[in-house]
Curated annotation (Swiss-Prot):
Belongs to the Sp1 C2H2-type zinc-finger protein family. Transmembrane segments: none annotated. It comes from Homo sapiens (Human). GO terms for biological process: bone mineralization; cell-cell signaling; cellular response to starvation; circadian rhythm; negative regulation of cell population proliferation; negative regulation of DNA-templated transcription; negative regulation of transcription by RNA polymerase II; positive regulation of osteoclast differentiation. This is Krueppel-like factor 10. It holds the Pfam family zf-C2H2. Ubiquitinated; mediated by SIAH1 and leading to its subsequent proteasomal degradation. InterPro entries: Znf_C2H2_sf (IPR036236), Znf_C2H2_type (IPR013087). The modification Phosphoserine is found at S184, S249. The lineage of its organism: Eukaryota, Metazoa, Chordata, Craniata, Vertebrata.
Amino acid sequence: MLNFGASLQQTAEERMEMISERPKESMYSWNKTAEKSDFEAVEALMSMSCSWKSDFKKYVENRPVTPVSDLSEEENLLPGTPDFHTIPAFCLTPPYSPSDFEPSQVSNLMAPAPSTVHFKSLSDTAKPHIAAPFKEEEKSPVSAPKLPKAQATSVIRHTADAQLCNHQTCPMKAASILNYQNNSFRRRTHLNVEAARKNIPCAAVSPNRSKCERNTVADVDEKASAALYDFSVPSSETVICRSQPAPVSPQQKSVLVSPPAVSAGGVPPMPVICQMVPLPANNPVVTTVVPSTPPSQPPAVCPPVVFMGTQVPKGAVMFVVPQPVVQSSKPPVVSPNGTRLSPIAPAPGFSPSAAKVTPQIDSSRIRSHICSHPGCGKTYFKSSHLKAHTRTHTGEKPFSCSWKGCERRFARSDELSRHRRTHTGEKKFACPMCDRRFMRSDHLTKHARRHLSAKKLPNWQMEVSKLNDIALPPTPAPTQ
């Protein structure tokens, strides 16, 4: 138990007089400073803890940094003042956070931004014209916004049963909370607008709007939605369009990617319009090859090329534009009489004659034997064939039949052998289908053709053909 004497009260009154002599400008400048040094914080704690009892009106303007819970629990033994019991409940630190001021609700009302909020105490958050200090950590434009690392919670517990704060008991606190929320919302909206002005990507960025900055945000959104960014892309490079993690406006934005210009001899190619269509996907990188139109046939309107990707791509969107190939246009082929010829068939007289490769012919198959009789000129492979042919011109018949009483003579030996079969009746050529036999091979060949056409011919024709095959009976050989 501690008892404070007259000396302690006198010391407190002296400090209170020193504090009252300070000008109000220094107090307001103290409140508006974002970062306080340790020495000034200790001085403020000591001065406010001793001077808040006697001058309550001054306390309302400038609330102490440390609440009354830092004092001793035996304050009721001191000679009290009439203003002690009239102190409102929001000056005390309750043993729990008030129900009408939840940190999660305040954080949800704020616009999403990559910032970290640090709350020093509950009493600082209730100041009407002072916003909590912000520590902005600028990240890369691809990273997603992070949630606040700290939340406003009560860490100083007091044994006194303080009345719960509400709109009736603490009107100043309710008004300060509303002002704090409005200031935080304005500050975050302003940060979003500044980030959108600095880093406007290929896709348009439309930050959240607020009533106080409607004109500024509308101008940024209007410029970003109407802009088409033109990139001059060489054939060996790649255009990388990075997207901002801020919310994208509902209407789809277009990116204009122009292929490299062609030389003076060719026709300049038409630009390619690339349009991103929102599509939920897990892959953050979308790679697309844009085929360029042939320069020989430039279209009247640029054909739009549609790509499918995520709504807000977290990675890079690559547009690979190939270098257009200049095709040398050939003049149409015109015939000598002036008519245009079709390119399918070669023009007569203009196509170069290809060298014909003659296959090598066997020397044994060359008709080197030519008949020397005037007006004939026939050629043969063998000399024996040429000799038999010359006998037709001379009339020589060296082969004679040896059958008794037969004096026939032949120019060729095969003709003599065939004639001899007529005397003997020999039929050495037999049909494999009907076992019929023939003296000559050509007769057997003719008979085989009838078997192939037997199904097509009627019976009476077959019979007639058989009658034609009947040969005359050979004359019997005279007996000697």
